[in-house]
Regions:
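Bacterial N-terminal signal peptides that target proteins for export
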Residues: 2-13
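N-terminal signal peptide c-region/cleavage motif recognized by signal peptidases
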Residues: 19-24
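Boundary of Sec targeting at the N-terminus
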Residues: 26-28
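Sequence context surrounding c-type heme c attachment/ligation sites in exported
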Residues: 32-64, 68, 72-73, 77-165
């Protein structure tokens, strides 16, 4: 084998190694590893909605420091919600999760619910940015119903017991 052919083979092997390493480095984490980040993001969304509700209850709404940024959080998180439930990230992952198997058994309905949340969250951000108090109150109720419509069939009742304040 000539030196030139040897160099070409070495370069080809090195390129294959780099491509394989890059693929492994950028691959999605295993489903079980996605449960905790999913739970954290969902808690962020719930906390943001609670902060907005608390502002409404106060009777004096701080739009710029409380409502608008929290509405943005809800909208930003909602955009990705359907990506947070890959197959294998339910109870079969053997990691504590409140996600019920029904999510994957009825994924078309779950997707529909997720898209409704995305639309409601976008509307929440719109009324927040407009500083529309009546619109905000109505949209918070709407998004609460959307959350409940998904939580009832797809989240374990253990969540409420484990997260009592």
């Amino acid at each position: 084998m000539s030196m030139s052919a040897f160099r070409i083979r070495c370069v080809a092997v090195a390129a294959l190694f780099v491509a394989t390493a890059a693929t492994v480095a950028f691959a999605d984490p295993p489903p079980a590893a996605q449960i905790k980040p999913r739970q954290d993001k969902l808690r962020d969304m719930g906390g943001a909605l609670k902060a907005i509700t608390d502002e409404i209850k106060k009777g004096r709404i701080d739009w710029d420091n409380a409502v608008i940024p929290n509405a943005q959080t809800v909208k930003d998180r909602s955009v990705y919600i359907l990506n947070w439930f890959p197959k294998g990230s339910g109870p079969e992952a053997h990691v504590k999760t409140y996600a019920l198997p029904a999510i994957w058994q009825k994924f078309d309905d779950f997707t529909k619910q997720g898209k409704q949340l995305q639309a409601d969250a976008a509307k929440l951000q719109q009324v927040a940015n407009a500083k529309d108090e009546a619109g905000l109150k109505a949209q918070v109720q709407t998004i609460g119903k959307t959350c409940k419509a998904c939580h009832d069939p797809y989240r374990s009742p253990d969540y409420e017991k484990d997260n009592e304040e």
